[in-house]
Amino acid sequence: MSWQNNLRSVSPYIAGEQAELTDMIKLNTNENPYPPSLQVQKVIEDFKSDNLRLYPSTDAKVLRKALATYHHLNTDQVFIGNGSDEVLSLSFLTFFNSEKPLLMPDISYSFYPIYCGLYHIPYQKIPLADDFSLSVNSYFQENGGIVIANPNAPTGMAISLQEIEEILQNNQDSIVLIDEAYIDFGGESCLPLLEKFDNLVVVQTFFKSRSLAGIRLGVAFGSAEAIAHLYDMKNSFNSYPIDSLAQKIGEASLNDETYFQKSVSKIITTRENFKKELIKLGFQVTDSKTNFVFVHHPKVDATTLFKALYEAKIIVRHWNQARISDWLRITIGTDREMNTVIQFLKEYLKNKEKSY
Amino acid sequence: MSWQNNLRSVSPYIAGEQAELTDMIKLNTNENPYPPSLQVQKVIEDFKSDNLRLYPSTDAKVLRKALATYHHLNTDQVFIGNGSDEVLSLSFLTFFNSEKPLLMPDISYSFYPIYCGLYHIPYQKIPLADDFSLSVNSYFQENGGIVIANPNAPTGMAISLQEIEEILQNNQDSIVLIDEAYIDFGGESCLPLLEKFDNLVVVQTFFKSRSLAGIRLGVAFGSAEAIAHLYDMKNSFNSYPIDSLAQKIGEASLNDETYFQKSVSKIITTRENFKKELIKLGFQVTDSKTNFVFVHHPKVDATTLFKALYEAKIIVRHWNQARISDWLRITIGTDREMNTVIQFLKEYLKNKEKSY
């Protein structure tokens, strides 16, 4: 016997590398290339540190209300957590306490099975089609819950509002969790379905489209009943998850709609141009509605290309995982960064041709 | 069947009321009456919001190293979490996965049994003596872990380094978690025992003695092995729990030792003076080594006094709980605030005498 016998064994998630090379082009963790709204800078400059001696609002009250107004929901339909990973984690713990399996696509955010391992939630991976498309019919079976990222990661592909509605209609006895971390880049949010379904929970984040990865703000929207259960869970885990400054920063970002729309549409334009160039170079590219693309070249081994890019100080993401080991995920940076990537790929492919 | 059947039921913690009265004297949640170090103000003013588009360091690398240096430990002996509540929560989940009961004092931080409920950890409350003192012998029995707040909350009473060593020596097959949230106000930290015991985990916080309740920084210290397990757990729950600004603020606070010592010693002086005055008024007062006092008046019902104080806009804390329902916990504020409390109590007791 030893204290080690009482440890709970887990298989932790491995986050994308935070490489620290100088002059690198960092396209591996889907960070936004543009700074947050100037309102954020202002709110930080104006912040009086005296306030920090006091506890923050336990439910980020002002921000919660602002988010409700923004999305035309009631305040009690909004939950705020310490980044969307925490929101997902607490949601899994709250809603998926069943002996029936949680259903999820076989290719999706790799944190989902880790939460399942942590909380002993049985789960079943539902294979996507060969083209990574999702068939809603495969979710019409007994389950203890459903989690789908829409748009999906790392494929970037989205499903329609109607498809989500079909899943909800056929699963009214389970929570259907739709992870909309990337929704602002072109997908269609299913928030309007909250009017019809009390078993829908939608998770979003401030980090990608609002350039606030550094501040950790994640959100869940749902029926007042579901959200109340999520708060009960949060209050069993940590009373004050969101610090005072983060709350203010979230409010400031939410108030600057013009900047938000502008920076999101810049990224979408860059993505579409980047996609066209990739296709010209012979890449296969999924129809991404996110701030990244998922790409494959029939003539190039993905691991080899990943390494070549890395040596050129262009950091992208690759998974040594069945079905996607031939693919790379590339975050959309600035036009300039993406042009550098295209120039590199042109050279790389040209040299490769020569060596045949 | 409905989705409600799959909910995990919990009994959430209820935090001290964040009353929003004007001109109130808020002495109910142990917040520090003094602002944080001026270095904190400076680091906020100098912070460039552009940095927020990037993820924070997953383990608050720089702050982690600074804390290790500060406490003469190795970096791998330091864990940083989103407030000490999160650190405690993850520690319970990591270390107390046994069928034998976790031992804790019957009167202690009321979040402990809530974590146990959440994670299905069996626990056994060990009664403190009538004077709220802790007998180490009662912890020499089979267990799946031990958690003791030192100084204890809400009694404020501390145990000695030697007593903790005895507990460790007799429980080498369990993690002994010492919660030192209030240690800076006069208790003796057991960090030096880390040299001898790999089953000791010590939790501290930035919020009380460093006036940073608003920023959410909690810390665990332990053997490199124990801390590695805690990080595995954290990485199964949330990759990036500490935002970039909080990391910088923590560093700034840690660097200003002079201010830290000064504000802590001011609070200790105020506490000792306040205690003397209370004793003069006939109160029974525990030997608190914290930034609060725990008091009882033989002639006054605690609930009645709590309400009278509340009406005078002096907010303190009371628990309707066996053994302590006759007691009030009063946070140490400024000298001026504590004088106001004493003046109120003098009047109150005088009027009470009259009404006999």
UniProtKB/Swiss-Prot annotation, chains A, B:
GO terms for molecular function: histidinol-phosphate transaminase activity; pyridoxal phosphate binding. It catalyses: L-histidinol phosphate + 2-oxoglutarate = 3-(imidazol-4-yl)-2-oxopropyl phosphate + L-glutamate. Transmembrane segments: none annotated. Gene3D superfamilies: Aspartate Aminotransferase, domain 1, Type I PLP-dependent aspartate aminotransferase-like (Major domain). Pfam families: Aminotran_1_2. Its EC number is 2.6.1.9. GO terms for biological process: L-histidine biosynthetic process. Its cofactor is pyridoxal 5'-phosphate. It comes from the Bacteria. Keywords: Amino-acid biosynthesis, Aminotransferase, Histidine biosynthesis, Pyridoxal phosphate, Transferase. Belongs to the class-II pyridoxal-phosphate-dependent aminotransferase family. Histidinol-phosphate aminotransferase subfamily. PANTHER family: HISTIDINOL-PHOSPHATE AMINOTRANSFERASE, HISTIDINOL-PHOSPHATE AMINOTRANSFERASE 2. This is Histidinol-phosphate aminotransferase. It comes from Lactococcus lactis subsp. cremoris (strain MG1363).
